[in-house]
């Protein structure tokens, strides 16, 4: 009977607590293997957190630094016009070109950068001598004005002053009492005739061009096309505007054969004659 009771007791179901204890005894090794996995993953999690923190800081600080940089730039002298220099001019003073830009040291370089073409056009409009103009920005606030000029071909005497004549035929409004002696003085030409005479003058050899002191629309001997050229070497040329471009090349050979100053007549033919009394007095 005792053996039967023991058999019955062994077949009784386990209580919940006994079941839990039995499971715990079966899984300790499995649990010990899982703990190291948690320890290995922990540094990776910390690294990811640090990266995320750095990324958030960059996203916050970068715009702030950019704003501070922009405000600092506009508050500094580097944001405004500094040194302005001119390249390419020979007859127009540099300061006159700079004044034509109407730039001041209070103007922002950013505004200059966006309006370079307009400023260049302002220079060309203010100074007829300037053929081309362009602005280049160097560094933070240095401006270089690169220019080219229309060639000066002579002067015309008007209103008690000598006014420059450009190769385009335009007569400048500004006059001077001391013209550059390397350029001839034109007189007697109409506004229509002056550009035509300039075109003829450009066809002369350079050495002869430099030796001309005056060009007069003399219109003598009933010839409306007659001109007179007074030369720096003391000779005078009488010619016709319709033929002078072809005949002017004979001038050096003619004067090389005579020792006396006089008139080189290229109007009809090509020859030398001495000054008449009236021509000599007017030439003196």
Curated annotation (Swiss-Prot):
Residues 1-56 are cytoplasmic. The chain crosses the membrane at residues 57-77. Keywords: Cell cycle, Cell division, Cell membrane, Membrane, Transmembrane, Transmembrane helix. Its main location: membrane. Cell division protein that may be involved in stabilizing or promoting the assembly of the division complex. GO terms for biological process: FtsZ-dependent cytokinesis. The gene is divIB. Residues 1-38 are annotated as: Disordered. HAMAP family: DivIB. This is Cell division protein DivIB. It comes from Lacticaseibacillus rhamnosus (strain ATCC 53103 / LMG 18243 / GG). It is found in: Cell membrane. GO terms for cellular component: cell division site; plasma membrane. Residues 79-150 form the POTRA domain. It is a single-pass type II membrane protein. Belongs to the FtsQ/DivIB family. DivIB subfamily. Residues 1-10 have a biased composition (Basic and acidic residues). Residues 78-284 are extracellular. InterPro entries: DivIB, FtsQ_DivIB, POTRA, POTRA_FtsQ_type. The keyword Lipoprotein does not apply.
């Amino acid at each position: 009977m005792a053996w039967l009771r023991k058999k019955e007791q062994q077949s009784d179901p386990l209580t919940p607590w006994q079941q839990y204890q039995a499971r715990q005894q079966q899984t300790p090794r499995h649990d010990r293997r899982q703990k190291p996995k948690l320890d290995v993953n922990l540094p990776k999690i910390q690294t990811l957190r640090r990266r995320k923190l750095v990324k958030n800081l960059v996203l916050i600080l970068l715009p702030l630094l950019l704003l501070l940089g922009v405000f600092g730039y506009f508050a500094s002298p580097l944001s405004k016009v500094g040194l302005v220099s001119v390249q390419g001019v020979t007859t127009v003073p540099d300061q006159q070109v700079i004044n034509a830009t109407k730039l001041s040291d209070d103007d922002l370089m950013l505004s200059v950068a966006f309006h370079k073409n307009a400023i260049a056009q302002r220079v060309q409009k203010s100074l007829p001598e300037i053929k081309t103009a362009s602005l280049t920005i160097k560094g933070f606030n240095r401006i270089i004005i690169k220019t080219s000029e229309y060639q000066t071909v002579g002067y015309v005497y008007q209103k008690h002053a000598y006014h420059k004549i450009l190769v385009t035929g335009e007569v400048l409004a500004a006059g001077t009492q001391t013209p550059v002696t390397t350029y001839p003085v034109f007189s007697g030409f109409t506004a229509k005739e002056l550009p035509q005479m300039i075109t003829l003058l450009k066809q002369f050899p350079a050495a002869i061009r430099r030796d001309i002191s005056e060009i007069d629309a003399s219109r003598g001997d009933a010839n409306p096309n007659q001109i007179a050229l007074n030369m720096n070497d003391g000779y005078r040329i009488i010619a016709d505007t319709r033929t002078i471009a072809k005949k002017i090349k004979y001038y050096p050979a003619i004067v090389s054969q005579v020792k006396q100053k006089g008139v080189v007549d290229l109007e009809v033919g090509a020859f030398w004659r001495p000054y008449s009394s009236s021509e000599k007095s007017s030439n003196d």
